[in-house]
């Protein structure tokens, strides 16, 4: 008997485009749907524009994720620099 696993959001592509491409699409869509920043849920408004659903604050981030890896590195560096000055 066949395995009845759920296909996820990229299941709409069927057997097309390859396994890796479908997996990347599924990961991006999962990150976009369940995006949080500091515990608050955020929603994607446009390319790189996100809005905090609880406070209404708009901010920029990555195209598909609210925080990019480079942005997280910069934020960590700023926290370290500010912590050293005090």
UniProtKB/Swiss-Prot annotation:
GO molecular function: large ribosomal subunit rRNA binding; structural constituent of ribosome
Family annotation (InterPro entries): Ribosomal_eL37/eL43, Ribosomal_eL43, Ribosomal_protein_eL43, Ribosomal_zn-bd
Ranges in coiled-coil conformation: none
Region (Disordered): 59-86
Key word Zinc-finger present: no
Gene3D superfamilies hit by this protein: 2.20.25.30
One cellular component (GO) term of this entry: ribonucleoprotein complex
One GO BP annotation of this record: translation
Keyword Phosphoprotein: no
Keyword annotations of the record: Ribonucleoprotein, Ribosomal protein, RNA-binding, rRNA-binding
HAMAP family with a match to the protein in the record: Ribosomal_eL43
Family, similarity comment: Belongs to the eukaryotic ribosomal protein eL43 family.
Known partners and oligomeric status: Part of the 50S ribosomal subunit.
Function: Binds to the 23S rRNA.
Name listed for the protein in its UniProt record: Large ribosomal subunit protein eL43
Originating organism: Natronomonas pharaonis (strain ATCC 35678 / DSM 2160 / CIP 103997 / JCM 8858 / NBRC 14720 / NCIMB 2260 / Gabara)
Lineage of source species: Archaea, Methanobacteriati, Methanobacteriota, Stenosarchaea group, Halobacteria
């Amino acid at each position: 008997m066949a395995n009845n696993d759920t296909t996820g959001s990229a299941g709409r592509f069927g057997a097309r485009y390859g396994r890796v491409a479908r997996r990347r699409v599924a990961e991006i869509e999962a990150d976009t749907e369940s995006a949080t920043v500091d515990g608050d849920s955020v929603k994607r408004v446009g390319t790189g524009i996100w809005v905090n659903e609880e406070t209404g604050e708009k901010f920029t981030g990555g195209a598909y994720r609210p925080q990019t890896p480079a942005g997280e590195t910069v934020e960590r560096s700023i926290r370290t620099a500010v912590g050293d000055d005090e």
